[in-house]
From Swiss-Prot:
Record NCBIfam families: DNA_YbaB_EbfC (TIGR00103)
Transmembrane segments: none
Quaternary state and interactors: Homodimer.
Role, per record: Binds to DNA and alters its conformation. May be involved in regulation of gene expression, nucleoid organization and DNA protection.
GO cellular component: bacterial nucleoid; cytosol
Gene Ontology molecular-function annotations: DNA binding
Record's subcellular location: Cytoplasm, Nucleoid
Name this polypeptide is given: Nucleoid-associated protein BCc_301
InterPro entries assigned to the protein according to its UniProt record, in alphabetical order: YbaB-like_sf, YbaB/EbfC
Gene3D superfamilies documented for this protein: Nucleoid-associated protein YbaB-like domain
Keywords, comma-separated and alphabetical: Cytoplasm, DNA-binding
Family named by the database record: Belongs to the YbaB/EbfC family.
SUPFAM superfamilies, alphabetized: YbaB-like
Length: 102
């Protein structure tokens, strides 16, 4: 049976965890992520909110003949950046939860 003290303790822990999660979310939003494809031929820069901030396309592939390739590389670079943000979120959140066993 839960006592008033136990309930208060749980509420305090929940508040601490909420503040930690807010800090993690803020940190992730401020993080800059670089996604690449084609061995660096296309680079996408995003922030932790999944907003694309910049796109770089290497001069080697920048011509009319490579249009389809460039489109594929841009898509791949965006997906690479999104995957990095997702992994960063998982790592930061898991490290701050009581489920982490380290």
């Amino acid at each position: 049976m839960y006592t008033k003290e136990k309930i208060n303790e749980l509420m305090e822990k929940a508040q601490v965890m909420k503040k930690e999660m807010e800090k993690i979310q803020k940190d992730i939003k401020m993080t800059k992520i670089k996604g690449e494809s084609g061995a660096g031929l296309v680079t996408i820069f995003m922030n932790g909110n999944y907003n694309c901030r910049k796109t770089k396309i290497n001069d080697e592939i920048w011509n009319e003949k490579n249009k389809i390739l460039i489109q594929d590389l841009i898509t791949s670079a965006i997906n690479n950046a999104v995957n990095k943000i997702t992994e960063l979120q998982k790592k930061k959140i898991i490290l701050k939860t009581p489920f982490h066993n380290e």
